[in-house]
């Protein structure tokens, strides 16, 4: 029914197209049939009701055969196993992972809820926070995979309603038991997660989960997974350390320009949500619109599931719960009324109607529970999946932005290096010119010194400008230079000794003050621009080498990220189609069972009413 909905990010395609669209030759596995618990009450099919109740069962059997074949095909037996739990998982691919119990743990001085996980004959107890850390670790190790979600944490409304009992709410604990089991079984079907050495250790009772988190590969992933390769984040190369990190809200550059592939066409509205064709090799720029459209459609689906669908489901379940309570009260009233009736046939008929109301109450309550477990909860999980898909697509976008940033930074460094090299060449030309003209400089200096010496012998009136000249020199040079300049004029100091003492003390204070200023100025004034320029050129060349290596790994990362995301999106596509079909079948079966049981009991009540004898 979804084939015509192009805007649906999980839109189905033709069967042949779906089977041939795998980006890499991997086995696509379908969901287990035991992901969600069966309805609380299961009744045998009645062939007289409708053919619809028979076909889903037959098709489910076929699907079960396919599931078993797919699961067995996805497992490769090993000759040596690292632990008993790994052997169980590989040798029994159809064995479910169950959460059998949830209760308080009083060991270690704390009181918290732990969940008992059973895999075959092995059991391990884990907290909710450990499940959360497992999922976060899997997301870090596999950023291109759509890692299944786990139930959400307690909301602030829960804590406000039950400040001390929020974590012990039986309904929330039962929900977590079901959904955490679904999470573990979904992870088991993903080959990359199953073989990464982290997930199965979570199920091993002989392994400390804290030690797993602080050992390779979990501890080897960089804090920012953008500085690691997409397919192997636990083993980054040195070049990944030089990659720039874009902001979380960064966007791709406009893709409205000329396409890099001459035969590629930008996808129009008619193929929104579709995967790129395999017949053409598209560049990353040509792939961008497909991912962008898929992300936008996924966001729309998330809003739909979290908005209108969630409201309708909650309202329906509340209505069924209220109806069951009314039927319970109605049955009690009819039963009480039958006791006061004098006519035996009427009393029996009324009692039978009351029993039918009681049966309807029980069946309606079971219908409410079954719809909540088999339809409402999976729909909430689908909304969480939509958020996970958007985060994976966002990772690929950030990798593309990172590549563009690296390329831009490399271009800037090249321009800077060219500018520095031009400046270096200009400085060398100026130096060569000065070297050619430098032999004439000593003659001028000697003539100047001779004329200054002649003028210094002129008299007291002519010596006064020399003193002013000395003062100007003192103010322009550091104290060491000022002392050498003052030594050239000993005559003025000999003519007036008192003035000399006063001037020398003043000069000492001035030299001390100006010396500090000169030292401070030398701290931020380039005293050796030539050496600084050469150092800058060397550092720029080193940065160029690093950025060239970073650009190389960034281009490879983008290709790997696109391939990995596309591959897992196609796997996820098939799983979602099977999940959606299972949800709809479960929804119909719940109502069929409810209607069948009510039809039987009310038919019996009608027969009793027909037996009433009129007086």
Curated annotation (Swiss-Prot):
Protein family per UniProt: Belongs to the sorting nexin family.
Binding site for a 1,2-diacyl-sn-glycero-3-phospho-(1D-myo-inositol-3-phosphate): 127, 129, 153, 176
Record-annotated PX domain positions: 93-210
A Pfam family hit: PX
Naturally occurring in which organism (per UniProt): Emericella nidulans (strain FGSC A4 / ATCC 38163 / CBS 112.46 / NRRL 194 / M139)
Job of this protein: May be required for cytoplasm to vacuole transport (Cvt) and pexophagy.
Record InterPro entries: AH/BAR_dom_sf, PX_dom, PX_dom_sf, PX_Snx41/Atg20, Sorting_Nexin_Autophagy
A molecular function GO annotation: phosphatidylinositol-3-phosphate binding
Protein name per UniProt: Sorting nexin-41
Broad class of the protein's primary localization: membrane
Location in the cell: Endosome membrane; Endomembrane system
Residues covered by region (Disordered): 1-71, 218-277, 432-504
UniProt keywords, alphabetically: Autophagy, Endosome, Lipid-binding, Membrane, Protein transport, Transport
GO BP terms: autophagy of mitochondrion; protein transport; reticulophagy; retrograde transport, endosome to Golgi
Family annotation (SUPFAM superfamilies): PX domain
């Amino acid at each position: 029914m979804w084939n015509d909905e192009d805007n649906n990010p999980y839109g189905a395609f033709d069967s042949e197209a779906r089977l041939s669209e795998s980006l890499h030759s991997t086995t696509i596995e379908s969901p287990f049939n035991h992901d969600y618990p069966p309805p609380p009450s299961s009744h045998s099919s009645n062939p007289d009701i409708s053919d619809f109740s028979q076909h889903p069962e037959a098709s489910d059997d076929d699907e079960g055969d396919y599931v078993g074949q797919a699961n067995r095909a996805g497992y490769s037996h090993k000759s040596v196993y690292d632990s008993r739990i790994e052997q169980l998982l590989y040798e029994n691919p159809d064995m479910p992972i169950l959460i059998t119990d949830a209760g308080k743990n009083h060991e270690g001085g704390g009181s918290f809820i732990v969940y008992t996980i059973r895999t075959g004959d092995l059991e391990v107890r884990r907290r909710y926070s450990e499940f959360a850390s497992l999922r976060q670790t899997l997301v870090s190790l596999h950023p291109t995979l759509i890692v299944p979600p786990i139930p959400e944490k307690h909301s602030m409304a829960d804590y406000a309603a039950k400040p001390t009992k929020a974590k012990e709410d039986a309904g929330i604990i039962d929900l977590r038991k079901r959904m955490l089991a679904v999470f573990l079984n979904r992870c088991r079907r993903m080959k990359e997660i199953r073989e990464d050495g982290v997930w199965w250790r979570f199920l091993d009772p002989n392994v400390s989960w804290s030690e797993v988190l602080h050992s390779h590969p979990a501890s080897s992933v960089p804090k920012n997974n953008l500085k690691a390769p997409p397919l192997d984040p636990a083993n980054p190369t040195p070049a990944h350390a030089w990659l720039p990190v874009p902001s979380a809200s960064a966007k791709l550059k406009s893709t409205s320009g000329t396409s890099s592939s001459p035969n590629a066409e930008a996808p129009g509205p008619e193929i929104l949500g579709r995967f790129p064709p395999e017949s053409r090799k598209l560049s990353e720029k040509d792939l961008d619109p497909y991912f962008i459209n898929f992300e936008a459609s996924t966001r729309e689906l998330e809003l739909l599931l979290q908005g209108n669908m969630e409201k309708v489901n909650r309202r329906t379940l509340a209505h069924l719960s209220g109806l069951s309570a009314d039927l319970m009260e109605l049955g009690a009233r009819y039963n009480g009324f039958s006791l006061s009736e004098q006519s035996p046939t009427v009393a029996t008929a009324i009692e039978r109607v009351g029993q039918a109301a009681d049966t309807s109450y029980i069946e309606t309550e079971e219908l409410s529970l079954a719809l909540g477990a088999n339809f409402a909860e999976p729909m909430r999980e689908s909304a969480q999946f939509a958020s996970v898909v958007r985060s994976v697509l966002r990772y690929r976008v950030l990798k593309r932005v990172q590549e563009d940033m690296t390329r831009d930074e490399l271009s800037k460094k090249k321009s800077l290096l060219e500018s520095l090299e031009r400046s270096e060449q200009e400085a060398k030309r100026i130096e060569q010119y000065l070297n050619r003209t430098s032999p004439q400089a000593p003659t001028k200096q000697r003539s100047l010194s001779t004329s200054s010496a002649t003028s210094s012998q002129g008299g007291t009136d002519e010596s006064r400008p020399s003193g002013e000249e000395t003062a100007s020199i003192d103010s322009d040079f550091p104290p060491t230079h000022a002392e050498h300049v003052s030594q050239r004029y000993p005559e003025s100091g000999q003519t007036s000794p008192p003035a000399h003492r006063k001037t020398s003390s003043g000069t000492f204070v001035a030299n001390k003050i100006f010396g500090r200023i000169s030292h401070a100025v030398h701290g931020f004034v380039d005293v050796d621009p030539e050496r600084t320029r050469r150092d800058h050129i060397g550092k720029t060349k080193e940065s160029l080498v690093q950025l060239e290596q970073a650009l190389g790994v960034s281009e490879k990362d983008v290709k790997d990220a696109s391939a990995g995301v596309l591959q897992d999106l196609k796997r996820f596509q098939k799983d979602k189609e099977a999940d959606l079909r299972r949800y709809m079948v479960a929804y119909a079966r719940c109502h069929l069972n409810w209607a069948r049981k009510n039809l039987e009991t009310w038919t019996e009540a009608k027969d009793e009413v027909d037996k009433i004898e009129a007086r």
